[in-house]
């Protein structure tokens, strides 16, 4: 599992960003507050929640651990 990514933000298109880490670009879905806090061309650290499915490998990125923890709590709620 990927827990954290640190690299340069090379592309932003709400709600996704692409963060480059040693030549590999990771596409990360972000909530609006996180999207607004990362700057194009600057380094960023994102705390990751990874979802692996048969047809997809999704990365959800958050500016801090607390946002990620809240997201994980919401996933446990029935119907969400």
Locate the predicted segments by residue.
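Long, highly charged, low-complexity intrinsically disordered interaction regions
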Residues: 2, 6, 10-80
């Amino acid at each position: 599992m990927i827990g954290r990514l640190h690299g340069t933000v090379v592309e932003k298109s709400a709600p996704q960003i692409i963060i480059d880490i040693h030549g590999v670009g990771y596409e990360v879905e972000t909530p609006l507050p996180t999207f607004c806090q990362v700057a194009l061309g600057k380094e960023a650290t994102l705390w990751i929640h990874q979802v692996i499915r048969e047809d997809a490998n999704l990365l959800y990125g958050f500016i801090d651990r607390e946002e990620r923890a809240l997201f994980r709590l919401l996933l446990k709620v029935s119907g969400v």
